[in-house]
């Protein structure tokens, strides 16, 4: 193969880690953490909105 695979060394390194033992957990990036917080906050806002809507509909 004339062209080297760019990810070959990365894949081989990961395979060696898996052979030698338990792989290390990778830390979640800042973007992943912000995304998780945003999704949870959005879900809570939707739930609170639904609860208030139901309370308002039941009062009438």
Curated annotation (Swiss-Prot):
Principal cellular location given in the protein's record: membrane
Keyword match Protein transport: yes
Domain of life: Bacteria
Alphabetical UniProt keywords: Cell membrane, Membrane, Protein transport, Translocation, Transmembrane, Transmembrane helix, Transport
Disruption phenotype: No export of mature cell wall protein GspB, a small amount of unprocessed protein is exported to the cell wall while the rest accumulates intracellularly, probably in a glycosylated form. Cells bind less well to platelets.
Position of the signal peptide: none
Record field: transmembrane: 37-57
Pfam families per the UniProt record, alphabetical: Asp4
GO biological process, one term: protein transport
InterPro entries hit by this protein: Asp4
Membrane-topology annotation of the record: Single-pass membrane protein
Gene Ontology CC annotations of this record: plasma membrane
Subcellular location: Cell membrane
Function statement: Part of the accessory SecA2/SecY2 system specifically required to export GspB, a serine-rich repeat cell wall protein encoded upstream in the same operon.
Summary of subunit composition and partner proteins: Part of the accessory SecA2/SecY2 protein translocation apparatus required to export cell wall protein GspB.
Protein name: Accessory secretory protein Asp4
Lineage: Bacteria, Bacillati, Bacillota, Bacilli, Lactobacillales
Gene: asp4
């Amino acid at each position: 193969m004339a062209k080297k695979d760019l990810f070959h060394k990365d894949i081989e390194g990961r395979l060696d880690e898996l052979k030698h033992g338990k792989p290390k957990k990778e830390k979640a990036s800042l973007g992943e953490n912000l995304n998780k917080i945003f999704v949870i906050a959005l879900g809570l806002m939707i739930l609170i909105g639904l609860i208030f809507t139901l309370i308002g509909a039941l009062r009438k």
